[in-house]
């Protein structure tokens, strides 16, 4: 992987971290960030025709009554398995790479979803965020959610240890 590509991913992560920390400071409770923000955080490709606003922080909750009003934050109900991470220096929780992939299923074509998944299994150790087993396990233990069938359909097109997602399509 070129140094330029790595710097781009690091820059995207830094920008997302700033936006999400800012949103978390305005929140009165824990903020679980996912969707397009998590994709940027992990350096995954963003679907070309994704309808999610790039100007908002997208957070997920388990039920509609847990949504809150926070300026610049859009809450989504996600019924999949909760798999989150948090770094000590961050003020927000973020969806794991595999959970983010599952969340993006309803906003991606099959090809785009496979590209997102493959990018998370990169040959480059600095970019590798998940293994094929991680995806299989997540779908196995996760309850039904919107996009679950598309996730199963994308699995055969996702190859581990590739240099770039387009190698898979």
Where are these regions (language model features)?
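Short gly/ser-rich loop at a beta-strand->alpha-helix junction or flexible surface loop bordering the NTP-binding
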Residues: 1-155, 164-168
């Amino acid at each position: 992987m070129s140094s330029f590509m790595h710097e781009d991913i690091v820059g995207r992560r830094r920008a997302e971290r700033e936006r999400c920390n800012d949103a978390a400071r305005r929140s009165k409770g824990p903020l679980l960030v996912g969707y397009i923000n998590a994709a940027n955080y992990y350096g995954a490709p963003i679907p070309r025709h994704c309808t999610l606003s790039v100007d908002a922080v997208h957070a997920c909750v388990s039920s509609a009554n847990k949504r809150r009003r926070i300026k610049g934050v859009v809450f989504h109900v996600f019924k999949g398995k909760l798999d989150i991470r948090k770094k000590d220096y961050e003020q927000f929780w973020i969806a794991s790479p595999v959970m983010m992939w599952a969340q993006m299923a309803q906003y991606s074509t099959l090809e785009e979803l496979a590209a997102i998944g493959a990018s998370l299994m990169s040959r480059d150790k600095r970019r590798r965020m998940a293994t094929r087993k991680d995806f299989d396990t997540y779908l196995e233990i996760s309850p039904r959610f919107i996009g679950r069938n598309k996730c199963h359909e994308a699995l055969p097109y996702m190859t581990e240890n590739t240099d770039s997602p387009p190698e898979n399509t």
